[in-house]
Every structure is written in structure tokens, then in C-alpha cells.
């Protein structure tokens, strides 16, 4: 690399093309006329170009003349005429300071002020270019495809490593010259050490004369600090570009150029010296390369021949070893086949042994042996100890014989045997649980059950089991789990329990005696009647007390059985889950059958069946129940409600509405039937009434007192009717005792023939007492039956009172609305009407109180009762006027 000495033409030199610096050497420079030829440097400086310039000239002066001036680095004007030239014309060099000398341009000489001001030399320098200036060039068509950017990017990536190597070796600024010189000197012989030491000392002095920042990796000339270091206190007068400073500027340029050329000469000289020292080694290495290549070819041919020989030998050895291995494998396969036959024979022998155990009823040993045979068929000896002891001396692993068709019959036989054993265990479990269920139900009497339910006590007897019973259940569940029949055993018990609960109803159904059976059998055989009609007839022939007793026995027995079944459910579920959790290697079906171990679904099915069947039994006596006395009907209602509620408590859900619907239908029909029955009773009593004072029993007066007190509170004797344990019996016993006491004291107290209602006393009649009994029954039914029927019973009370008034007056009234002269004491009738008028007010206030506690009940309007009181008052006045004495004269 060289820098031109002449800084005159500043515009020539560094040109900017595509953003990179470009150094152009003019044609007229001495370097182009030198022997080394001309060269152009673009971009970064090249080491090879520097060597070329050094080799073309020996003297430093000649090399200095070939270098460009720093004037080329300075910025130039856009239209400087010194940079313009035409094709094939001679470019003016940096040192060409002469002109043509013609006086046509300036009479004052070259470069005169006149020439500069008038611009006589280059008047037409800004003319348009011609064909001579710019020759015609045929532009090529751009045939780039659409993906040219992708191709360029890929190409740049491919040459990136090569470019980095080139840049690191071709840029002198990125090289550490001292390290390269040191590496070159390490290869010299020992006899040149003294000469090299002296030369190294001289080279070091030359290198030390160059400032260190030129060898820095971060050398950047565009950095102001670096640029000032390069100038080294040389003033180029760049801020004053006038002609007055031109001479000083030229001297500064020359000084800077000379200094830089000296630095370059030092580096080039050292590089050429070091390279020339190693040139003979390079040629020696080239001569040895040919020899190495020849030897490498010979070695490759020998290696190929050796590889072929080794391949032949290996193939022969491999064939022998393969043949040997095939014989070994064949022998092992034969041994495995023999062991498999022994395994199959052992399976058959153990199966026969298992069959004999089953015939001897050794079920546990048989089940254990079946399990071991199953492992033997699977070829698994890792778990079962029996299989390990049977095959301890066998050399090979057991085979899986499950896919062998010859053993399919044996496997099926073992499976069936396991199922039969599980069936026996299941039957034992069901029998044990059913016996416990029966003994539990027998140990509890119906009264105890009713007392427990009505008092709300929970003795938890259903969950108490003896240790012996629990241990037996545990043993059976363990056996069932071993034979994988646990779920089927629970299903069997579920079916057995349903059958057992069905039989409870059959136990308490009515039956005929032997004599009656013969007569009725002959009659029914002739008529072709079915057993169902016979049972219906027997149910209808029962007395109310017998029917009630049958329902109580069925319901209490069934409830205790259901309680015990829920205890069985908890016990079985706890033991089963513990057994499943204790198994070390659970079966694949054990996790899926946990939900199948709960017998709750069977218990719920039992509840549905019992309610359905008892509902049908009750429906058979639907017509007969309409004529029941009110206390028997309430007992019937109470036991049905108790059973329905207890079933709901036990199951936790309302399973069926059948029994509830049957009971609701019975209540509705019973309430509707009360109207005609009451009319008949009242009509019968009035028709037979003689209107004479009637003896009032103490029980009747007690009922009247209860009716009066019902305005404020429910009488105790009315609410205890629903007590199934014995409250109503105590009440009846008390009444009979009072009656006997009154009869015993009759001779001393006389006959009581009046009814006391509050603070009023009325002479009693037979029809009055019968009507009071009707009113009492309706009020008792109103308190104890659901509130939805209150409106019906209020209407019945209202109609009964109204009907008594109309019937009584009709019995003593002529067609002309005048009273008959029958000779009977009509004042007794008036007393009865006045007494019932008091009951009208009591009935009104009674149902008004019930409406306050029952939002779904709306009582009669007060106007209805006012009208009824008016009717009673009119009848009483009419009777009074008929019996009044004539007025005095």
C-alpha cells in the first residue's frame, strides 16, 4: 500500500461508491510508469497488495512516489473539474501543475487572478455529456426471480465463515505483527541464533519507532481522538481552505505523508524479511506432499486388501458360530417344549387333586389349590408359593398356557368349580344373615316398636352384633373375595332378603280353619274362583280390630326387619371394604365392584314392595273402612302414617307414593261418607225421640267439657287417640270406671238428666246426646287428620247442626206451619235447640282457632253461623210461644 506524495489535486484519490471508500491512482502518477505496474485498492487495505508494491520498487523514494496523497481523503466539491475526464483521455496527476501556457485564457499568465475570476479556461466544463463521454451501453434485463433475497441471504450465510477467515488474514490492523514475527523466528536453526538476535533487536527498534495505537484492534480513523493521534501536532489548516494557506497546507500534507510512508516501509521490510526466511521451508513442504500422497495411496490399497481378507475370515467364523448358536437355540427350544409339557401335565394332575378335595367338601383347600393352578397356567411363579415349590428345579421360566386350546376345558372346569364354591359360600352367608334377621325380629314385640317410634328413641339395636356372628361374616367374606364371588353373594342375599320380607306379609294374612276350608273349598271350586278372590274375601271378613292388629303386626315386623337390614348393610360394607383394602395385589375388578357391595338398592326395593302390597290390602277394605268408628279409623290412619314416615327416615328418600295415595283416598272417601251417616243417625234419633229427660252419663259430660275447652286448646283425650301404645285404652278404661262409679252411686245421687255447657245447664234428650257425639267425632277427626280436610269437617259440623234443627221442627210441625198437639213435652225440644245453639258458637270459634295455625284452611264466614243461630232462635221462639200460658183476662 502506498500514499501519493503530491497533495495538489485534492479531489482525486478517495471516492465514495456504495458507501465504501475507494482509492484511485491517477494515470499520470509515477507509480503507473514504474516497472511494478499500476494497481487500485478498494475497501480495506490488502497485505498482498503491499507486498506487490514493495516487490516492484527497491528504493524507498520510488515506493513513496507510488502512494496516494492524503489529499484524496479530504472531501471534494461535487462539480470539481479536476475529477472529470472523457473516455480514453489522459487524467491529470497530482504533480501535474503545468498548463498549456496559451495567452488565450489569460494575458497575465497561468493561474492569474483574471483566469480564476473570468473562468476563461473552462467555460464549458458543465456541458451535457455526449456519446464520447458516455458510450452507449446495452443494459441487461433484470432476470432475478422473486426469491432472490432468500438466495442472497443463504449465500451470505454459507460464505460467512470463509469471509471471516479472509478478513482476519487480509486486514493488517487485525493482525498482531509481533506475534507473527515471533512464530516465524521459532523455526530457525540454532546456528543462526546470534544473527537472528541482532536482527531481532534491530527489528524491535524499527517496530518501536511506530506508535502502538496503529497496532490496536480498535483502530478507527474516523474517531477524532485517533485522527489527532495520527496528525501528531501537524496542522493541515482544514478550517481555512483559502489560497493563502495552500503552501503551508501542502507542506503539512507532505510531512504527514512522509511519516506514514516511513511507517509502512518499516512494516513491509520486516514482513518481506520474515517471509523470505521461511520460503525454503515452503518448497520443502511441497516436495514432501507428493511423497506423502504416494504413500497414502499405497497404504489405502494395502488396507483394502487387508479388510477383504478380514471380511472373508470373519464371515467364515460367523457362519460357524451362527450354526453353533442355532443348535443351542434348538436344544433350548426342545427343553422349553418338554418343560411346557410337564407344566401342562402338572396342571392336569393338580386339577384332579382339586376335584377330589371338592368332593370331600374341603372348600378352603380346594379354593387355594384353584388359585395356585390359575397362577401355574398363567406361568407366574413370582407370587404364589405353591407354584414356586412345584417348579423350583425347572431351568426355564414358566410358559403362559392360557392360549392353548387343549387346556380350555380344564380352565372352564376350574372356573365352574370356583363359581360353585362361591355359590356355597354365598348360600352360607345368606342363611346366616337371614337367621340373624329372623331372630332379631322375634326378640322385639310390636308394642316395643310402636313405643320406640312414637317416643323418638333410638336404641341402635340393629347395629349391635355378637363377636361370633361378626367373625363368621368376616370369614365368609374373605372366602368369597378369594373366589371372586363377593358381588354375586351380595346379590343373592339381596334377593333372599326381598323374599323374606315378602313372607312377613304372608305370615299375618288371615287364614281359614280346617272345617271352614273344606266348605269354602268345595264352594269355590264349583264357582271357579281364584286364590286372590279368596284372600280378598278373608280380608273383608275381618273385624276392624283384627284388621288393625294385622296392619300393626305387618308394619312393626317389617320396620324392625328393615332396621336390621340397614345394620347388615353397614356391617357387610365395612368388612368388605377392609378385606379389599388388605389385599396386596388387588384384582382388576375389585375397584369397580365397590359400588356393587351396597345392598341399599335391595332395601329400597323391599320398601317399595311392602308399601305396594299393603296398599293393595288396604284397598280391598276401602268400602268397609268407610263405616269404621272414628277412633278405629284414626288408629288405622296412625299406623299407616307411622310406617310411611319410618320408611322415609330409614331410606332417606320418598321411594313410592302408592301407599300415601291409598291412604289419602281412604281419608277423602271417609270424610265424604260421614255426611250421609250423620244424617241417618240424627234422623233415626229424632224419629224415635219422645222428648223426655234423658240420663246424662259422666263420659258424655266429659265430652261436652272437651268440646268447650277445644276453643282454646286441643283436649288431651282427643290427641292421645293416635297413641298406638295404649293411651286410648287408658282413656276408655277411665271412662268405664267413671261409668261404674256413677252406677254405684246412682242410688245415692239420683239420675242426672242435664247437660252443662259452660255456665249454662240444659235438660238433655236422647237426640241431643247423639248429636253432641257426632259433633265431637267430627272435631276429633279435624284435629288428628291432615289440615287439607278441615273445610270438609267444618261443613259436616255445620250441616249436622242445621239438619238437627230442621228435622226436629219438621217432626212437630203441621203442614200449615203450626205445631202439632202430640202431648209430648216440647219444652225439652226447646232445651235441646238452645243447647245446640251454644254448640254453633263453639264450632265457629274452634275452626277459627285451627285456621290461625293452618294457612291452607279458610273457615266459613261469620254470616253463615249468624244465619244458623237465627234459625235456632226462631225455632226456640216458636216452641216457646206454643207452650206459653194464655194471657190473663
Curated annotation (Swiss-Prot):
<dbReference type="GO" id="GO:0005829">
    <property type="term" value="C:cytosol"/>
</dbReference>
<feature type="modified residue" description="Phosphoserine">
    <location>
        <position position="72"/>
    </location>
</feature>
<dbReference type="GO" id="GO:0031966">
    <property type="term" value="C:mitochondrial membrane"/>
</dbReference>
<feature type="modified residue" description="Phosphoserine">
    <location>
        <position position="69"/>
    </location>
</feature>
<comment type="subunit">
    <text>Component of the Golgi-associated retrograde protein (GARP) complex, also called VFT (VPS fifty-three) complex, composed of VPS51, VPS52, VPS53 and VPS54. Also interacts with YPT6, TLG1, RBL2, SEC10, SEC15, EXO84 and ARL1.</text>
</comment>
<feature type="compositionally biased region" description="Polar residues">
    <location>
        <begin position="30"/>
        <end position="44"/>
    </location>
</feature>
<keyword id="KW-0597">Phosphoprotein</keyword>
<dbReference type="GO" id="GO:0006623">
    <property type="term" value="P:protein targeting to vacuole"/>
</dbReference>
<dbReference type="GO" id="GO:0005739">
    <property type="term" value="C:mitochondrion"/>
</dbReference>
<keyword id="KW-0496">Mitochondrion</keyword>
<feature type="compositionally biased region" description="Polar residues">
    <location>
        <begin position="1"/>
        <end position="14"/>
    </location>
</feature>
<feature type="compositionally biased region" description="Basic and acidic residues">
    <location>
        <begin position="729"/>
        <end position="744"/>
    </location>
</feature>
<keyword id="KW-0175">Coiled coil</keyword>
<feature type="coiled-coil region">
    <location>
        <begin position="286"/>
        <end position="321"/>
    </location>
</feature>
<feature type="modified residue" description="Phosphothreonine">
    <location>
        <position position="74"/>
    </location>
</feature>
<dbReference type="GO" id="GO:0005794">
    <property type="term" value="C:Golgi apparatus"/>
</dbReference>
<keyword id="KW-0653">Protein transport</keyword>
<dbReference type="GO" id="GO:0006896">
    <property type="term" value="P:Golgi to vacuole transport"/>
</dbReference>
<dbReference type="GO" id="GO:0010008">
    <property type="term" value="C:endosome membrane"/>
</dbReference>
<dbReference type="GO" id="GO:0000938">
    <property type="term" value="C:GARP complex"/>
</dbReference>
<dbReference type="GO" id="GO:0090156">
    <property type="term" value="P:intracellular sphingolipid homeostasis"/>
</dbReference>
<dbReference type="GO" id="GO:0019905">
    <property type="term" value="F:syntaxin binding"/>
</dbReference>
<dbReference type="GO" id="GO:0042147">
    <property type="term" value="P:retrograde transport, endosome to Golgi"/>
</dbReference>
<protein>
    <recommendedName>
        <fullName>Vacuolar protein sorting-associated protein 54</fullName>
    </recommendedName>
</protein>
<dbReference type="InterPro" id="IPR039745">
    <property type="entry name" value="Vps54"/>
</dbReference>
<comment type="function">
    <text>Involved in retrograde transport from early and late endosomes to late Golgi by linking the vesicle through the t-SNARE TGL1 to the Golgi, leading to the membrane fusion between late Golgi and endosomal vesicles. Also seems to be involved in protein transport from Golgi to the plasma membrane and is required for the integrity of the actin cytoskeleton.</text>
</comment>
<keyword id="KW-0333">Golgi apparatus</keyword>
<dbReference type="GO" id="GO:0030476">
    <property type="term" value="P:ascospore wall assembly"/>
</dbReference>
<keyword id="KW-0472">Membrane</keyword>
<comment type="similarity">
    <text>Belongs to the VPS54 family.</text>
</comment>
<feature type="region of interest" description="Disordered">
    <location>
        <begin position="729"/>
        <end position="748"/>
    </location>
</feature>
<keyword id="KW-0967">Endosome</keyword>
<keyword id="KW-0813">Transport</keyword>
<feature type="region of interest" description="Disordered">
    <location>
        <begin position="1"/>
        <end position="44"/>
    </location>
</feature>
Amino acid at each position: 500500500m502506498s500514499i501519493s506524495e503530491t497533495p495538489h489535486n485534492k479531489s482525486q484519490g478517495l471516492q465514495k461508491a456504495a458507501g465504501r471508500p475507494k482509492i484511485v491512482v491517477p494515470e499520470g502518477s509515477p507509480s503507473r510508469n514504474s516497472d511494478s505496474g499500476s494497481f487500485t485498492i478498494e475497501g480495506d487495505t490488502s497485505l498482498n497488495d503491499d507486498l506487490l508494491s514493495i516487490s516492484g520498487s527497491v528504493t524507498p523514494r520510488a515506493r513513496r512516489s507510488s502512494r496516494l496523497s492524503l489529499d484524496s481523503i479530504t472531501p471534494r466539491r461535487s462539480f470539481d473539474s479536476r475529477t472529470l475526464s472523457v473516455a480514453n483521455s489522459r487524467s491529470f496527476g497530482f504533480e501535474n501543475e503545468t498548463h498549456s501556457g496559451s495567452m488565450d485564457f489569460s494575458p497575465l499568465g497561468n493561474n492569474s487572478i483574471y483566469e480564476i475570476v473570468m473562468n476563461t479556461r473552462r467555460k464549458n466544463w458543465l456541458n451535457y455529456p455526449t456519446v464520447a463521454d458516455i458510450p452507449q451501453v446495452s443494459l441487461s434485463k433484470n432476470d432475478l426471480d422473486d426469491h432472490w433475497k432468500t438466495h442472497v441471504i443463504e449465500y451470505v450465510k454459507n460464505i460467512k465463515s470463509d469471509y471471516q477467515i479472509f478478513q482476519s488474514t487480509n486486514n493488517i490492523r487485525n493482525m498482531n505483527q509481533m506475534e507473527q514475527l515471533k512464530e516465524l523466528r521459532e523455526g530457525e536453526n540454532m546456528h543462526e541464533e546470534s544473527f537472528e538476535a541482532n536482527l531481532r533487536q534491530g527489528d524491535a527498534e524499527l517496530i518501536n519507532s511506530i506508535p502502538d495505537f496503529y497496532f490496536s484492534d480498535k483502530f478507527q480513523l474516523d474517531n477524532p481522538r485517533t485522527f489527532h493521534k495520527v496528525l501528531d501536532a501537524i496542522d493541515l489548516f482544514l478550517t481555512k481552505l483559502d489560497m493563502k494557506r495552500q503552501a503551508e497546507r501542502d507542506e503539512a500534507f507532505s510531512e504527514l505523508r512522509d511519516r506514514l510512508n516511513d511507517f509502512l516501509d518499516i512494516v513491509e521490510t520486516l514482513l518481506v524479511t520474515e517471509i523470505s526466511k521461511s520460503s525454503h521451508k515452503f518448497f520443502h513442504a511441497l516436495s514432501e506432499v507428493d511423497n506423502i500422497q504416494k504413500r497414502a495411496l499405497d497404504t489405502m490399497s494395502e488396507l483394502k486388501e487387508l479388510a477383504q481378507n478380514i471380511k472373508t475370515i470373519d464371515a467364515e467364523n460367523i457362519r460357524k458360530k451362527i450354526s453353533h448358536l442355532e443348535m443351542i437355540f434348538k436344544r433350548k427350544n426342545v427343553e422349553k417344549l418338554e418343560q411346557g409339557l410337564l407344566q401342562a401335565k402338572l396342571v392336569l394332575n393338580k386339577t384332579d387333586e382339586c376335584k377330589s378335595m371338592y368332593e370331600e367338601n374341603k372348600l378352603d383347600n380346594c379354593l387355594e389349590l384353584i388359585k395356585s393352578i390359575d397362577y401355574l397356567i398363567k406361568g407366574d411363579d413370582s407370587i404364589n408359593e405353591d407354584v414356586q415349590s412345584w417348579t423350583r428345579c425347572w431351568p426355564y421360566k414358566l410358559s403362559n398356557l392360557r392360549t392353548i386350546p387343549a387346556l380350555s376345558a380344564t380352565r372352564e372346569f376350574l372356573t365352574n368349580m370356583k363359581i360353585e364354591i362361591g355359590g356355597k359360600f354365598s348360600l352360607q352367608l345368606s342363611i346366616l344373615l337371614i337367621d340373624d334377621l329372623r331372630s332379631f325380629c322375634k326378640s322385639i314385640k310390636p308394642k316395643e316398636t310402636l313405643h320406640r317410634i312414637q317416643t323418638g328413641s333410638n336404641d341402635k339395636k340393629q347395629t349391635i352384633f355378637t363377636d361370633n356372628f361378626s367373625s363368621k361374616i368376616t370369614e365368609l367374606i374373605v372366602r368369597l373375595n378369594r373366589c371372586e364371588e363377593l358381588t354375586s353373594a351380595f346379590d343373592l342375599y339381596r334377593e333372599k332378603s326381598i323374599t323374606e320380607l315378602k313372607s312377613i306379609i304372608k305370615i299375618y294374612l288371615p287364614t281359614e280353619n280346617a272345617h271352614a276350608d273344606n266348605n269354602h273349598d268345595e264352594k269355590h271350586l264349583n264357582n271357579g274362583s281364584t286364590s286372590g278372590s279368596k284372600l280378598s274375601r278373608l280380608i273383608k271378613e275381618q273385624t276392624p280390630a283384627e284388621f288393625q292388629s294385622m296392619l300393626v303386626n305387618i308394619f312393626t315386623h317389617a320396620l324392625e326387619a328393615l332396621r336390621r337390614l340397614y345394620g347388615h348393610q353397614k356391617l357387610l360394607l365395612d368388612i368388605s371394604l377392609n378385606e379389599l383394602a388388605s389385599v396386596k395385589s388387588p384384582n382388576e375388578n375389585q375397584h369397580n365392584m365397590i359400588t356393587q357391595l351396597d345392598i341399599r338398592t335391595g332395601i329400597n326395593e323391599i320398601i317399595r314392595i311392602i308399601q305396594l302390597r299393603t296398599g293393595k290390602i288396604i284397598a280391598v277394605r276401602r268400602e268397609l273402612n268407610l263405616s269404621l268408628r272414628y277412633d278405629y279409623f284414626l288408629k288405622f290412619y296412625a299406623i299407616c302414617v307411622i310406617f310411611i314416615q319410618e320408611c322415609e327416615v330409614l331410606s332417606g328418600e320418598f321411594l313410592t307414593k302408592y301407599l300415601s295415595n291409598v291412604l289419602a283416598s281412604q281419608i277423602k272417601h271417609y270424610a265424604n261418607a260421614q255426611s250421609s251417616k250423620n244424617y241417618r243417625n240424627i234422623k233415626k234419633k229424632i224419629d224415635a225421640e219422645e222428648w223426655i229427660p234423658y240420663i246424662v252419663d259422666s263420659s258424655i259430660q266429659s265430652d261436652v267439657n272437651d268440646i268447650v275447652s277445644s276453643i282454646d286448646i286441643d283436649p288431651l283425650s282427643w290427641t292421645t287417640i293416635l297413641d298406638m301404645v295404649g293411651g286410648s285404652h287408658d282413656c276408655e278404661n277411665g271412662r268405664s270406671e267413671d261409668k261404674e262409679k256413677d252406677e254405684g252411686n246412682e242410688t245415692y245421687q239420683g239420675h242426672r238428666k242435664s247437660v252443662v255447657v259452660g255456665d249454662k245447664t240444659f235438660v238433655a234428650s236422647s237426640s241431643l246426646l247423639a248429636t253432641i257425639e257426632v259433633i265431637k267425632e267430627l272435631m276429633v277427626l279435624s284435629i288428628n287428620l291432615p289440615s287439607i280436610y278441615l273445610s270438609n269437617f267444618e261443613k259436616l259440623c255445620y250441616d249436622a247442626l242445621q239438619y238437627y234443627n230442621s228435622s226436629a221442627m219438621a217432626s212437630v210441625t203441621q203442614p200449615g206451619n203450626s205445631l202439632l198437639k202430640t202431648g209430648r213435652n216440647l219444652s225439652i225440644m226447646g232445651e235441646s235447640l238452645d243447647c245446640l245453639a251454644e254448640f254453633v258458637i263453639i264450632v265457629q270459634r274452634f275452626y277459627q282457632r285451627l285456621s290461625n295455625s293452618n294457612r291452607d284452611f279458610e273457615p266459613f264466614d261469620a254470616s253463615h253461623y249468624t244465619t244458623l243461630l237465627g234459625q235456632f232462635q226462631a225455632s226456640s221462639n216458636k216452641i216457646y210461644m206454643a207452650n206459653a200460658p194464655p194471657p190473663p183476662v
